[in-house]
From Swiss-Prot:
Subunit structure: Heterodimer of an alpha and a beta subunit. Different beta subunits determine nucleotide specificity. Together with an ATP-specific beta subunit, forms an ADP-forming succinyl-CoA synthetase (A-SCS). Together with a GTP-specific beta subunit forms a GDP-forming succinyl-CoA synthetase (G-SCS).
Protein name (database record): Succinate--CoA ligase [ADP/GDP-forming] subunit alpha, mitochondrial
Residues reported in the UniProt entry to bind substrate: Y189
Biological pathway: Carbohydrate metabolism; tricarboxylic acid cycle; succinate from succinyl-CoA (ligase route): step 1/1
The protein's Enzyme Commission number: 6.2.1.4, 6.2.1.5
Keywords tagged on the record: Ligase, Mitochondrion, Nucleotide-binding, Transit peptide, Tricarboxylic acid cycle
Subcellular location, record wording: Mitochondrion
Consequence of gene disruption: Viable. During development, results in delayed egg eclosion, reduced glycogen levels and extension of the third instar larval period but without change of the duration of the pupal period or final size of organ. In the adult, results in defects in locomotor activity. Results in disregulation of both glycolysis and the citric acid cycle (TCA) including accumulation of Succinyl-CoA and succinate, and reduction of GABA.
Underlying gene: Scsalpha1
Gene Ontology molecular function terms on file: nucleotide binding; succinate-CoA ligase (ADP-forming) activity; succinate-CoA ligase (GDP-forming) activity; succinate-CoA ligase activity
Matches recorded under PROSITE patterns: SUCCINYL_COA_LIG_1, SUCCINYL_COA_LIG_2
First-level EC class: ligase
Alphabetized NCBIfam families for the sequence: PRK05678.1, sucCoAalpha
Amino acid sequence: MAASMRALLKVRDGFVAGVRCNSQYNKTRGNLKLNGDSRVICQGFTGKQGTFHSQQALEYGTKLVGGISPKKGGTQHLGLPVFASVAEAKKATDPHATVIYVPPPGAAAAIIEALEAEIPLIVCITEGVPQHDMVKVKHALISQSKSRLVGPNCPGIIAPEQCKIGIMPGHIHKRGKIGVVSRSGTLTYEAVHQTTEVGLGQTLCVGIGGDPFNGTDFIDCLEVFLKDPETKGIILIGEIGGVAEEKAADYLTEYNSGIKAKPVVSFIAGVSAPPGRRMGHAGAIISGGKGGANDKIAALEKAGVIVTRSPAKMGHELFKEMKRLELV
């Protein structure tokens, strides 16, 4: 099991390098931006999860305009039209985003269908998508410049008080000035709650997921946050496994330095994790001498990031730094 995971991680690291150099897919980073007018459709709309979270999204105020269920096209669900395919839904509703609540065996096919329909933002919530399926998705992603994938195995993405796409609790979010990006769903909620409590609020929160093969990484989100004039500070939540945090540190060193640098606070989960053992997420494993928490912490601190050892202090540390910089 450990050997097969190490092999997958090597493939993943190769893909990360490929995507980093791929200007085609990088052009879709702007698709992460959401607002109150963002139109959303749902794949797996009439299933148990799709129904529950679509109802939650509607109650939050998200502009959900329809859903997809291949065998129920032409009907209505939650007062919205049901379509037989993503292509049909796109033609009728012109969505900016689709959210996927399809079971693991069919999730990759659902992503590919949305990709072929050129939906700008694809958010896959599904956990347990086979990694060999995601390799195929990754191949398709990096060869195009129309669609951006968030996930799989993630809580989703939310522009507080405007558009909620995913399973996150809406009530803890507040419109404000902090960008949050995280590999961990529950720690995302912790950061959100803390920044709400100290009065900072959030501009955009992205749960990128903890699988080895995902569609959006830290750097994709950091670029959006650094370019957004409304985002005054950033929280980055990482964990053991891979080198995404180290690459994020390199990016911040290059693009977030000097007098106009935005304050960044980070927490890295898994400090006490033993090498070779997966800790929760499929990608959370220290392998081949890489992926340890201490290496990530050192890289981020070298880039000027404030790394807190306690997840309970993320909001407090960011507020303190923003106050020092007279940003609040």
